[in-house]
Amino acid sequence: MLLMVVSMACVGLFLVQRAGPHMGGQDKPFLSAWPSAVVPRGGHVTLRCHYRHRFNNFMLYKEDRIHVPIFHGRIFQEGFNMSPVTTAHAGNYTCRGSHPHSPTGWSAPSNPMVIMVTGNHRKPSLLAHPGPLVKSGERVILQCWSDIMFEHFFLHREWISKDPSRLVGQIHDGVSKANFSIGSMMRALAGTYRCYGSVTHTPYQLSAPSDPLDIVVTGLYEKPSLSAQPGPKVQAGESVTLSCSSRSSYDMYHLSREGGAHERRLPAVRKVNRTFQADFPLGPATHGGTYRCFGSFRHSPYEWSDPSDPLLVSVTGNPSSSWPSPTEPSSKSGNLRHLHILIGTSVVKIPFTILLFFLLHRWCSNKKKCCCNGPRACREQK
């Protein structure tokens, strides 16, 4: 009996020793920001302190565990809504959660989390090289640049809670820029990206966001088919429709043109022949060129199929293989207009030249007669 009591006491002591470091503050919680730690000035963010399960009570610290004045002496429950966010809120944060059974009553501090406040400088630009459509496994470079001399650039993917990627800006030809490399494209890296810039003395006060850039991973599903109605060669001014179809049940089709800045998208419609199709009307005034289409599903809009085989659309009788824009006159109409101007100008100039020649000829004839008859005749003529 005594041996059993001693054994239970040893087990209890062992459990206390194991629990002590966790409940006594050695097991770190983590601090989260929702919807994102990158917050526009005037926006809002909710901070929560977690440890396995969310703490009922927690305290917030900013920069080296110093209380922010609005946090001083306050214990938060569930979460803290920071609104409206100002530049004063930018910086490093940690939290401590309450542990009723720990000696100190509080956990160890969490790892720091950075709150970045945006909208403090003019937005930079974001480009993808070689382009925003990236085949699975291939490399893409996202370049953030600005004519403002930013010391650092940040790249952030929407709806991702982790801190943005950060690079030092390189100055070249009066432009500050940074190249963010994605070495091997995969599903997890596709999405909408924005970039920001910051200056040295305020590293967590960022510029306005760049325009959004959608990075799409392709080559994940079988390719659809692309055809032209009435055909890939049409008469000038004739309408043409491009049809993208597949037996795969794609929800959306995307049409891209080589050299085009934007793709067009249309929902797929199920046809009686059990194919899923979308018809893209180009109309008589859109450009010809080489087209491809892709398919995607509703639940993964940034994950596309292999591209269809390329389809060259051209205009017969037009050497440029493209239709003129409604706001741009064709070369033929421009030449005719130039010819009309030349003809009109010539009609005015020819009679004027004849009249000038006639007057000059008459003047010379009178002068010749004057010289033949002598000075007296000339004076009489005057």
Swiss-Prot record:
**Membrane topology according to the record:** Single-pass type I membrane protein
The protein, known as: Killer cell immunoglobulin-like receptor 3DS1
Q: Which positions, given as ranges, span the membrane? A: 341-360
Regarding protein family, the annotation reads:
Belongs to the immunoglobulin superfamily.
The residue ranges for the Extracellular side of the membrane come to 22-340
Where is this chain glycosylated?
A: N92, N179, N273
Disulfides per UniProt: C49-C95, C144-C195, C244-C293
Q: Which residues lie on this side of the membrane: Cytoplasmic?
A: 361-382
Identify the gene encoding this protein.
KIR3DS1
The record lists the lineage as: Eukaryota, Metazoa, Chordata, Craniata, Vertebrata
Domain of life, per lineage: Eukaryota
The annotated subunit structure for this chain is:
Interacts with HLA-F open conformer; this interaction is direct.
Per the entry, what this protein does is: Receptor on natural killer (NK) cells for MHC class I molecules. Upon interaction with peptide-free HLA-F open conformer, triggers NK cell degranulation and anti-viral cytokine production.
- The signal peptide here is 1-21
Q: Which SMART domains match?
A: IG
| SUPFAM superfamilies, per database record | Immunoglobulin
Where does the record say this protein resides? Cell membrane
Which GO biological process entries does UniProt record here? Answer: immune response; immune response-regulating signaling pathway; natural killer cell activation
Species name: Homo sapiens
Keyword list, A-Z: Cell membrane, Disulfide bond, Glycoprotein, Immunoglobulin domain, Membrane, Receptor, Repeat, Signal, Transmembrane, Transmembrane helix
Example of a GO cellular component annotation carried by this entry: plasma membrane
GO terms assigned for molecular function = MHC class I receptor activity
Which tissues is this protein detected in according to the database? Expressed in NK and T-cell lines but not in B-lymphoblastoid cell lines or in a colon carcinoma cell line.
What residues does the Ig-like C2-type domain cover?
Answer: 42-102, 137-202, 237-300
